[in-house]
């Protein structure tokens, strides 16, 4: 009986030890939502770099259950979905799609020109989010905390005809989504048409209903706009100001162990160091492919960029927007607009 008891104890200990790796490996799964399908520059970078670093830094305690292509939430519902935290813990939000809730985040896109390469763009956003707590506060009001920002491609002007002068768009019809960019095009002489985002925009370009499309390069490529409007003006400095925020539900973050919160922070730091180079490499690959497929790309000179900026009368547009916000009691809008303008102007002077 004594030997039998010892054997039972040994068996129990062995079972516990063999089960321990499985228990440890289970970890905490954070449900991730993204409105875009997996496979483009941003989604691959997030999965292969940020998510991998989170698992590595947490020693496997944290794992990501990724859902792409709006499987959990569309881009327009992501803010509320993540704020509630019942269906997803972390995910991408695009401030432009929730302008009322993320009012101050709209400021970025109001600048026609910005940093001229990926590294400079990353430095700019890092500084802004570190220096101005108003942005974190705005997210906090929606029960969210930003883990890491990601950026997209610059603006491309897809046109049916060659040699379009961006400073003189009289008699031309354009499609663009941003209310800022609509004002810019109208100030440069163009007319803007409202159309839902789908392949019918390419058809409208082909038939002449539209003369041009102003959109980030990869989105234009998604609907094959270059097949109907093969002449593309672009520059890395034609700054879309389109920031993707990878956020976490505040309650979810607070429920994590301190060591796991620190692991996520280290993963974000590593990711950010690689982001600028990834942006530049992705842009180079995309433009090369577009050219190989027959598109005629024109890299705008600095003088052409400044001509476009002047034609937009962007400061007038900004001032009108600030007046509207201040009339609603949003007193931070004007101050932040001024501060970001100074930062971008200082960046431009450094590049001269």
State each model region's role:
Residues 1-5, 9:
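Positively charged n-region of N-terminal signal peptides that target proteins for export
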Residues 25-122, 135, 139-140, 144-352:
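N-terminal secretory/targeting leader peptides
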């Amino acid at each position: 009986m004594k030997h039998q008891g010892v054997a039972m104890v040994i068996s129990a200990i062995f079972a516990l030890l063999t089960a321990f790796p499985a228990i440890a490996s289970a970890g905490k799964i954070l449900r991730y939502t993204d409105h875009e399908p997996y496979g483009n520059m941003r989604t691959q970078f997030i999965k292969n770099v940020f998510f991998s670093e989170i698992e590595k830094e947490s020693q496997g305690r944290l794992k990501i259950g990724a859902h792409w292509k709006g499987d959990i939430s569309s881009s327009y519902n992501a803010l509320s979905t993540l704020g509630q935290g019942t269906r997803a813990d972390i995910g991408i939000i695009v401030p432009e799609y929730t302008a009322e809730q993320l009012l101050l985040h709209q400021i970025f896109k109001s600048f026609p020109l910005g940093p001229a390469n990926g590294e400079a763009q990353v430095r700019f956003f890092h500084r802004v989010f570190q220096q101005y707590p108003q942005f974190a506060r705005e997210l906090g009001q929606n029960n969210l905390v930003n883990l890491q920002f990601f950026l997209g491609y610059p603006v491309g002007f897809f046109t049916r005809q060659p040699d379009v002068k961006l400073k003189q768009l009289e008699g031309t019809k354009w499609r663009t989504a941003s209310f800022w960019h609509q004002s810019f095009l109208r100030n440069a002489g163009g007319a803007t048409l409202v159309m839902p985002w789908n392949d019918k925009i390419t058809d409208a370009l082909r038939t002449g209903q539209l003369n041009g499309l102003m959109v980030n390069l990869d989105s234009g490529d998604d609907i094959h706009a270059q097949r109907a409007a093969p002449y593309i003006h672009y520059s890395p400095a034609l700054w879309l100001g389109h920031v993707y925020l990878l956020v976490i539900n505040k309650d979810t973050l607070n429920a994590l162990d301190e060591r796991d919160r620190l692991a996520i922070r280290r993963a974000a730091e590593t990711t950010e160091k690689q982001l600028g180079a990834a942006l530049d490499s992705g842009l180079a690959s995309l433009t090369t492919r577009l050219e190989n497929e027959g598109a005629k790309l024109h890299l705008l000179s600095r003088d052409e960029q400044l001509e476009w900026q002047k034609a937009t009368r962007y400061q007038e547009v900004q001032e009108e927007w600030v007046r509207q916000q201040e009339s609603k009691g949003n007193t931070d809008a004007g101050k932040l607009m001024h501060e970001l303008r100074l930062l971008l102007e200082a960046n431009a002077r450094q590049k001269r």
